[in-house]
Amino acid sequence: MPQGRTLATYSVGVKFVADEDSTMLLAMGATVDWTSFTDPKYGTVGKRFIPAGTAVAITAGKLVVTDNIKVTYLMASDVIENPLFYRGSDDTSGLYAGGIFFEDRLPDSTAGFLAAGTKTAMGSNFVFQQSAGLLVVGS
C-alpha cells in the first residue's frame, strides 16, 4: 500500500451474522401471521415492523412469536406490515435455520443474551458468540 494512505475495512451484510458461510437457510421462508406480533415493541396495527434477527416459530405455515417450545428460527430480513407506505419487505421473510451468530446483536437479546428457553428451542444448529465490536480499521 502506498505510504500516506489508509485502508478502512468495514463489515457488510447482516450485522448479527458472525460467519456468512456457516448459515443454513430454510428453503422458502414463510409469511408472517401479524395477529401473533402484538407486543408494542413491534409497533401498532398497520404499522408493525419486525427486524431481521427476530426469533420466530412456524405455526400453520406462518411465522409467529416463538413460544420457546416449537423449533425456532431467526428472520433473515426486516418485515414491515404495510410495505406500500414504508421501506422493507412484504409479509414474508427468509429464515436462518442455523449458523454462527452474534448473540448481542439480535433484537431479542437482553443485556447481550437471548433467553435460555429461546436458545433451547433453536437447538444445536445455532452457535452464539459476542461481537466485541466489528469495525476494523487498519493502515
Predicted regions, residues:
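Surface-exposed, low-hydrophobicity beta-strand/loop segments enriched in small/polar/acidic residues
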Residues: 1-139
